[in-house]
Amino acid sequence: MLESSSKKIKNRKWWLILALPAWVYGVFLAVEVVVSLAVGALIKIGVPLNSVNSVIFNTVLSVVVYILSLIVVIGVPFLAKKRRTTLSNLGVNDWPTFLEIFISPFAFVAYFLLTMVTMSIASGVFSVDMQQKQAIPFSQSMLATHWQFIMAFVVLVVLVPIVEELLYRGYLYGKLRNSFSIWLSIIITSIAFGAAHLWVGPDSPLQWAVAVDTFTLSLVMCATREYTGAIWVPIMMHMAKNGIAFYFLFVNTGAINQTESLLPFIFM
């Protein structure tokens, strides 16, 4: 019995703990760089991308980066090593069940309460600035018409949650869970998800408040992924969070001053 469990521990591919998160995040960064260089090259040869409406431009850019990242993360291991990732591996083998829809609000409340604790600890112990906001591809001044609001909404509240959940709670958590325990898989996935929101560019400060909040969000979303076997609850939670942020940032901006001191983590 002891020999069997010791063999299992030895046979585990511990390098995956670093390799898988680095692969998911590294691909996303690489795709961003490649797309950015491609845009710069097109502008240099005379393609008038500078004259394109900023909302349309950022929407198209976001769609390209997110979809391409998903394709590369899943496709390259299959092409190179025949490591296939099925819909079942990603947690999307079936449509959302009534149970998943029912528990989503409760899971969101659990995250809400837990992040109040983690953000308080981060603020009190590590002096993290809780008023720090997440860098996003749209600003209030950019959105002037209904279709611009719709495009920003589709990117922030639909595209981003779906693709990020496929990458992190789907691909990353699923692959880690094949080799490691529930809690180790949850912790590694959540650290990776938080770290992915920490750095946004060489000219911007590290987003520590955002990293702590997204780490906490991931803990709850990974738990629901494990419980239900699917990523529908994480997707619904992620959409709800981004939807609330979208409402306060772009629709009812006057409410921010009244609620930001109480719930700063919502505006990320």
Show the residue positions of the predicted features:
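Transmembrane helix-loop-helix hairpins at the membrane interface
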Residues: 113-116, 134, 138-268
